[in-house]
Structures are given as structure tokens and as C-alpha cells.
Amino acid sequence: MPNVLSDDEELLNGLGSEIMKPSRQGNHMARTVKRWVNKERATTADLKNVNIDGVHGPVNTESYISPGQLYSTDSGNLFHAGRILVVLVGLPATSKTLLSVAITRYTRWLGVRTKSFHFSEYKESAKNIPSDYFCVVPTSKEGVAFVEKLRMQMLNDILAFFNDLSGQLAIYDALNIRKIDRKNLETTFSEIGVKVLFIESIVSDQEIMNRNIALALESNDYKGLSTDEAIDEYMRRLSVNEPYYEMMTHDEELSYIKYINLGKQIIVKDNIHGYLVNKIVFFLMNLRQKKGCVYFARCGTSDKDNYIHDEELNEEGIHYSQVLKDFVLQRIKQKRQAKKNSDSLVEVIDGSHDEDLKTSLIVWTGPRKRTHDTALFFSKEGIKVQQRSELRQLNPGSIADLTDQQIMDKFPSEYKESLKDPYHFRFPRAESYHDLAVRMEPLLLEMEHTSKDILIIAHESTLRVLYGYLMACTCVELPNLNFTRDKLVEISFSPFCNTVELLNIPLTS
């Protein structure tokens, strides 16, 4: 057998490392070479402490391990992909920021060290901003100098991310609508061994364009302007840049993806970047503009709350189910009414929209009886309820239905190990949270594909994984997230980050 370790450094702590030495027999066939290195000790966390979207947080090179990460390497690079720069291309209000943040969230979840760099953020931190900064070719000397200064600052930060922070995927979010600018980026980064992939976002659908414009007008660029003034200013910026827009073509000899109307059509040219870029393309095929919120709720109670016996709801659990249904429907109706009363241009930025609840709300539940039965009152209202096998709770294996003291007595060494790394550790014949996250990836993609309001009724273990993805939690935080039955978790979407609100369910009247 060839020496796998010397054949490819990527297998050092990843796929295939277990074949280098005989495995030690045990309850869960422990590895002799650690897959996870430099792991932080887990600390307690609740939703109040992790209610800020972590998608823009720093990547800690010493301990960066993501919930969906399959393996780790010494270099930090995964999927044999090397370093990649993704360059967004498009006019204002064509979903470039939405794409950059969504790709960042997904690839970070996979374990790729990713960071998005937004021109708008650099502009907001600058002083003495000239009035023509928004044009790809400013008309004043001050504007030219200002844009060039910010551009160089962004490029230097991207280089530092690759060289100093072991970054693997950087996303450059700016207009990049001229061929000469794209060619310069390709030349600059190819010379240092960074592959460059362009994603051109094209929006011709008027409904998508209108919502993008409304979202853009909510940004700091238009702060203090009336609605009419903001629209006029936006149209001025668009008209100034349109003459310089050169759509990507084959004669540029660049690798690119044309992303048309938020995934209704995707064109890929010269994809020479391998598996990781293919994962990104597949993700983009599933990505849609969000018009709804995601709600998380625990299932109702049963008499013994056992794992082994698939119990039915008790009287308290049935009462909870009725109250949950009333509360969720009331919340959605309130949000829609608030939208109607608002003079904001953002049609559905907070998740409310105009469709009937029977068609605009979907309920996903786990496969166990009490989880599905918690949603029966929604079915009676004519709302679609789906049992999802992916929402099957974490399998506790040999420790099912044991108390903490019983686990300590029966599995003392395993219990101590589980405290060191509760995310990756498996008890005998059990799943780890990592196993759960990997098998739930198809559901994450379907959640990205759905524009409706979604209520997910599930066990706490699966809610932790879903919340961890949407709020970019680390694998240190995720196992300790606390979901209680008296709280409904509401996650709303915006292009730059997700927001969460904890709502009190009125279980006592």
C-alpha cells in the first residue's frame, strides 16, 4: 500500500488517515491520528449570547474548526482546492452582497477559511468622501484618488488574509464591471498562485430588481434622504455606471459564472477549480431570495420524555401545540400588518409577504410521533406539514434515557472525553453533533431554496445545528445552545446578515 501521508498532505488529518495504522478496538473505533487539532474547550452558550450573526467574524487560524467540516489539514486548505479569489461582478442592486455573504456562510460551514471583502464597508469607515465615489470611473481627481485608495486597501487586506491568516477563499464584493479591471485582478492574483473565479450577477426580473433597490435604499448610503430623494439618488448612480458596464464574454479568457435572476439560470465557463467550486455552483443553484422567516420551536412534552419509546404527547404537550399554532399564526399576521402600515420601500425585508398563510407557510417536523403531533393543529388550518427524516434527533446510542450521574457511573472515561469536545465526541453506538450536521446538509440547502416562512418543530439537537448554520456559530458554541419550550426563535434574513428574535410563547394565561 502506498504511503498515503506522503502522497498528499491533505490526508494528514483527514480522509484516509485511519488506514496508516491499525485502529484501536473500542466502542466507536477511535482514530489513532487525530482528525481535529487545536480544539478549544467548550463553554456554555445560550441564544442570548450568540444572537449576533457570526458570518463576518474573524477566522481564528489556531482553532478554526467549523460545524460541517469533514477534516482538517496543516495548511488549512480543504478539498485539494488551493487558494481562490471569488470576484463579484455587476451593477448596483444586483444581489452581489447577498451572494458574497451567502457563499461565505456556506463555505465557512464546510470548514473553508472564507472572508468577504465589501467595498461599501471600506467606504463607510472613510472620511472626506467625494460625491462621485460611487462611479467606477470618478470624474474628479479627488474621486479617482479616493476609489484607488480604497481599492488598494481592499487588495492588501485580501493578500494579508491569504498570506497571514492562512485564508483559502476570499470574496471581493465591488462593481468590477470593466474588462480591464477584471483582467488586472486575474493577473495580480494568478502571479501569486491564487485562482480567480468571477461571478457575474445579472438581474432582469423586475420584481427582483425592485426588491434589491428597496434593500439598497435601506443602507447607510441613503440615510437621511426621503423615499423620493433616495430613489433619485440610486437612479443617478445606476445611470452613471451603466455606460461602463462590459458584460463578461468568452473572449476575456477568464473563469466565470453568470448568475441570472438569483439562480433561475446559471452559466459556467471554464471551471478549472475543481470540487470546491463545484460545491459553490451547486449551492448557488439552490440559493433563492428570502421572503420569509425561519421559526424554531421545540416539540410538545410526553409523560416520560424518553428516546427509546416513541411516545405520544401528554395533555400538557397537546395544550402547548394549540398555543404554539395560535402564537405563530398571530406573529406572522402581525408582521404583515406592520408591513402594510410602514412606509418603507422594503417589500418583505423582515419576512412578511402578501400570500395566504396556507400557501406561504410550511411546517417541517421530525419523524417521531410527538414532534409530528405538535404540528397537527397547523394541518387542521390547511397549512402544509412535512415530516423530514433529516430532522431526526441526534442518536444518543448507549446513553439513551440515562441521567448524567448514570452516564458518569457507566461510562466514566467516555464522559470525561465528551466534556472536552462535546461536538465531535461519540458515545458508544451514538451519533456526534458532527455526524448530525453532515447528514443534515441537504436540508440546509433546501432551506436556502425556500422563500416561504418555515416553522421547524424538532428536537433541541437538530435545532442547534440549524441555528448554528443560519447564525454562523462555531462548533464550540453549538452543542450548548439552549432552546426552551417557552420561546419561539424567529430568524429574519437580509443581504448582509441574519437577525434573531426570541419570542415568549404565552403558555400560561
UniProtKB/Swiss-Prot annotation:
<dbReference type="GO" id="GO:0005829">
    <property type="term" value="C:cytosol"/>
</dbReference>
<dbReference type="Pfam" id="PF00300">
    <property type="entry name" value="His_Phos_1"/>
</dbReference>
<keyword id="KW-0963">Cytoplasm</keyword>
<dbReference type="InterPro" id="IPR027417">
    <property type="entry name" value="P-loop_NTPase"/>
</dbReference>
<dbReference type="GO" id="GO:0005524">
    <property type="term" value="F:ATP binding"/>
</dbReference>
<feature type="site" description="Transition state stabilizer">
    <location>
        <position position="298"/>
    </location>
</feature>
<feature type="binding site">
    <location>
        <position position="464"/>
    </location>
    <ligand>
        <name>beta-D-fructose 2,6-bisphosphate</name>
    </ligand>
</feature>
<keyword id="KW-0808">Transferase</keyword>
<protein>
    <recommendedName>
        <fullName>Putative 6-phosphofructo-2-kinase/fructose-2,6-bisphosphatase YLR345W</fullName>
        <ecNumber>2.7.1.105</ecNumber>
        <ecNumber>3.1.3.46</ecNumber>
    </recommendedName>
</protein>
<feature type="binding site">
    <location>
        <begin position="415"/>
        <end position="418"/>
    </location>
    <ligand>
        <name>ATP</name>
    </ligand>
</feature>
<feature type="region of interest" description="6-phosphofructo-2-kinase">
    <location>
        <begin position="6"/>
        <end position="291"/>
    </location>
</feature>
<keyword id="KW-0378">Hydrolase</keyword>
<dbReference type="GO" id="GO:0006110">
    <property type="term" value="P:regulation of glycolytic process"/>
</dbReference>
<dbReference type="GO" id="GO:0003873">
    <property type="term" value="F:6-phosphofructo-2-kinase activity"/>
</dbReference>
<dbReference type="InterPro" id="IPR029033">
    <property type="entry name" value="His_PPase_superfam"/>
</dbReference>
<feature type="site" description="Transition state stabilizer">
    <location>
        <position position="459"/>
    </location>
</feature>
<feature type="binding site">
    <location>
        <begin position="212"/>
        <end position="217"/>
    </location>
    <ligand>
        <name>ATP</name>
    </ligand>
</feature>
<keyword id="KW-0597">Phosphoprotein</keyword>
<dbReference type="GO" id="GO:0006003">
    <property type="term" value="P:fructose 2,6-bisphosphate metabolic process"/>
</dbReference>
<keyword id="KW-0418">Kinase</keyword>
<dbReference type="GO" id="GO:0005737">
    <property type="term" value="C:cytoplasm"/>
</dbReference>
<comment type="subunit">
    <text>Homodimer.</text>
</comment>
<dbReference type="GO" id="GO:0004331">
    <property type="term" value="F:fructose-2,6-bisphosphate 2-phosphatase activity"/>
</dbReference>
<dbReference type="InterPro" id="IPR013079">
    <property type="entry name" value="6Phosfructo_kin"/>
</dbReference>
<dbReference type="Pfam" id="PF01591">
    <property type="entry name" value="6PF2K"/>
</dbReference>
<feature type="modified residue" description="Phosphoserine">
    <location>
        <position position="6"/>
    </location>
</feature>
<dbReference type="InterPro" id="IPR013078">
    <property type="entry name" value="His_Pase_superF_clade-1"/>
</dbReference>
<dbReference type="InterPro" id="IPR003094">
    <property type="entry name" value="6Pfruct_kin"/>
</dbReference>
<feature type="binding site">
    <location>
        <begin position="460"/>
        <end position="464"/>
    </location>
    <ligand>
        <name>ATP</name>
    </ligand>
</feature>
<dbReference type="GO" id="GO:0006000">
    <property type="term" value="P:fructose metabolic process"/>
</dbReference>
<feature type="binding site">
    <location>
        <position position="298"/>
    </location>
    <ligand>
        <name>beta-D-fructose 2,6-bisphosphate</name>
    </ligand>
</feature>
<keyword id="KW-0511">Multifunctional enzyme</keyword>
<comment type="similarity">
    <text>In the C-terminal section; belongs to the phosphoglycerate mutase family.</text>
</comment>
<feature type="binding site">
    <location>
        <position position="433"/>
    </location>
    <ligand>
        <name>beta-D-fructose 2,6-bisphosphate</name>
    </ligand>
</feature>
<feature type="binding site">
    <location>
        <begin position="90"/>
        <end position="98"/>
    </location>
    <ligand>
        <name>ATP</name>
    </ligand>
</feature>
<keyword id="KW-0067">ATP-binding</keyword>
<feature type="active site" description="Proton donor/acceptor">
    <location>
        <position position="173"/>
    </location>
</feature>
<feature type="region of interest" description="Fructose-2,6-bisphosphatase">
    <location>
        <begin position="292"/>
        <end position="466"/>
    </location>
</feature>
<comment type="function">
    <text>Synthesis and degradation of fructose 2,6-bisphosphate.</text>
</comment>
<feature type="binding site">
    <location>
        <position position="237"/>
    </location>
    <ligand>
        <name>beta-D-fructose 6-phosphate</name>
    </ligand>
</feature>
<keyword id="KW-0547">Nucleotide-binding</keyword>
